[in-house]
Amino acid sequence: MNREKIETNEGMLFIWEDSEIREFWMKNTYFNLDLFFINQYGVIVEVYKNAKAFDERKIISKEKVKFVLEMKAGDIKANVGDNLICSSN
């Protein structure tokens, strides 16, 4: 992420053209994050809670996903099976 701070309810949404197994790590990340792995239908299929800042171990999705949402740890209470709805507004 390479940011020193993030505001409440801000995050990063990673979007790919295809669904694949995705890998992340926390190098250069100054705060803990929750990662939401989302399939091509917008359904959360896996949640990795409280990934530790600066941890260089890989976080690997268990299924193929098209989207990953990173949020500051604890900011949103989304669970496996919830839908993600995106708007450009």
Label each region the model flagged.
Residues 1-89:
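Compact, glycine-rich, soluble single-domain proteins
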